[in-house]
């Protein structure tokens, strides 16, 4: 009996010693910041996570990854930093701060932040068969200090003002405002992303008069709330082209009618023919005007059909204004050609019938 009791005591002591020397995996949780961490483009950002209850994580596997577990941003395993499995673009830009690893706290530092770094990061701890993770989120922000306002030459439709700004992240809010701070609906708005995924913004506004006073191009970063704006004052003289074009067209039409109808009236009186005669100068003058109108309309339709641009295209507004200007030029050119043809025809006809 004494021998059996002594053997049991020795077994109990050995088992206790083994439990003391062999570390056991305990349950734990991982805590991280609940709110997103803001990171300025080109700066540095730090993401921390902590074991709970606090305990040493030196012997654990610590893995930071984005959306794929097998493609870590940073990997710490068996007391070493392993760069072989790390995504190549993070190898030179990440560092794991382990000053408090004895308490279960580590910090991932990302250098030279780019727009690609925006999003979620998984902080993963593994101890034997026990593992837990927490998710941290990075919000990358970039604000451009350069805003350009361009004024295109006025045409019959009005004055086109365009605002451009490059280098924003994420996509900013963009709008036109008048001198009273009221929002002016834009004629068009578009954006694109460059190779660094930064947003290039473009917005246009077609003005028919100067009732808005000075106008402001306003941009706002939705994450930081930072605002940038540029204003411009438009002179009333820029909006006088509409009436000028109308006067020019009216004058040209009046001259056209004069040059066509006067010779035809003279010939009508000279020949004393009825207006219903197919060869009468009156009908010929009307025929020249009608033919010219058909040619002008045909050229206008052809011009617009061959240069059509989808409404969604960034150049739609500019192309539309270009087509309108070309249409006016075609009308003016055809009016002069018609005047010349009519003048030559009636003069020659009158000359040969003297």
Swiss-Prot record:
A family per Pfam: V-set
Recorded topology in the membrane: Multi-pass membrane protein
Function summary: May act by engaging a cell surface molecule on immature T-cells in the embryonic thymus.
Further comment: All hominoid species have a common inactivating mutation, but that Old World monkeys such as olive baboons, green monkeys, cynomolgus macaques and rhesus macaques have apparently functional SKINT1L sequences, indicating that SKINT1L is inactivated in a common ancestor of hominoids.
Keyword field: Disulfide bond, Immunoglobulin domain, Membrane, Transmembrane, Transmembrane helix
Residue ranges constituting the Ig-like C1-type domain according to the UniProt record: 161-233
Domain of life: Eukaryota
Protein name listed in UniProt: Selection and upkeep of intraepithelial T-cells protein 1
Transmembrane segments: 243-263, 283-303, 326-346
Tissue: Expressed in the thymus and skin.
Span of domain Ig-like V-type: 23-141
Organism, scientific name: Macaca fascicularis (Crab-eating macaque)
GO terms under cellular component: external side of plasma membrane
Molecular function GO terms recorded: signaling receptor binding
GO BP terms in the entry: regulation of cytokine production; T cell receptor signaling pathway
Sequence similarity: Belongs to the SKINT family.
Subcellular location: Membrane
Cysteine-cysteine disulfides: 49-123, 163-217
InterPro entries membership: BTN3A2-like_Ig-C (IPR053896), Ig-like_dom (IPR007110), Ig-like_dom_sf (IPR036179), Ig-like_fold (IPR013783), Ig_sub (IPR003599), Ig_V-set (IPR013106), IgSF_BTN/MOG (IPR050504)
